[in-house]
């Protein structure tokens, strides 16, 4: 096993994840992904603070890290340089969580506290410039904490929403085993 933690994000040969402890809350850790057969080493603390740091999302090129920072009942999406935190920007205002990068790394999506998904353009030159948050989608209710992602072509949001109006019966899942053998017949 490489390590234990929650909400892994992988890019550019690096792994960033959250760990929860009873004494500190949630903190972010990171490590280099090992080559086959090599010792993975020990995860290092990346973002350790009294606040809860969760939902890490590495940019596709591995130079920026977005995450949710929970402090005294308020959660915001933060963007910082990676691995060294030389610069830091607040992406959301009025509450935000669950950041997800576009495949090209030119936009960051996040959920507001009330549910809508926002998009912020990210321009990287000598510095990082953030655009104005724009409403993208108002999902009825996402099933998981993150519960959405951006399609590989960057043109669509893919999400898992709760089905409403089923009278509380829940959702059934059908598992088809050995379907390929049946298909060949």
Residue ranges of predicted features:
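Multi-bladed beta-propeller domains
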Residues: 1-6, 31-54, 79-97, 122-143, ...
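Blade-level signature of beta-propeller repeat domains, shared across WD40, Kelch, NHL, RCC1
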Residues: 149-185
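Beta-strand C-termini and the immediately following turn/loop, strongest in propeller blades
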Residues: 12-23, 29-34, 47, 57-60, ...
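Conserved beta-propeller blade repeats
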Residues: 1-20, 48-68, 89-109, 141-156
């Amino acid at each position: 096993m490489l390590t234990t933690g929650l909400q892994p994000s992988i890019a550019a040969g690096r792994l960033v994840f959250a760990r929860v402890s009873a004494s500190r809350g949630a903190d972010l850790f990171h490590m280099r992904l090992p080559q086959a057969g090599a010792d993975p080493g020990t995860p290092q603390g990346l973002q350790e603070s009294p606040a809860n740091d969760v939902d890490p999302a590495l940019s596709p090129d591995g130079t920026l890290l977005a995450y949710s920072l929970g402090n005294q009942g308020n959660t915001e999406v933060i963007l910082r340089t990676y691995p060294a935190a030389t610069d830091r920007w607040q992406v959301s205002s009025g509450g935000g969580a669950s950041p997800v990068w576009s495949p090209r790394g030119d936009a960051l999506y996040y959920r507001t506290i009330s549910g809508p998904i926002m998009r912020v353009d990210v321009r990287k030159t000598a510095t990082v410039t953030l655009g104005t948050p724009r409403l993208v989608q108002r999902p009825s209710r996402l099933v998981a904490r993150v519960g959405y992602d951006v399609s590989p072509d960057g043109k669509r949001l893919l999400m898992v929403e709760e089905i409403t109006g089923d009278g509380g019966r829940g959702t059934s899942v059908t598992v088809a085993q050995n379907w390929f053998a049946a298909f060949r017949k």
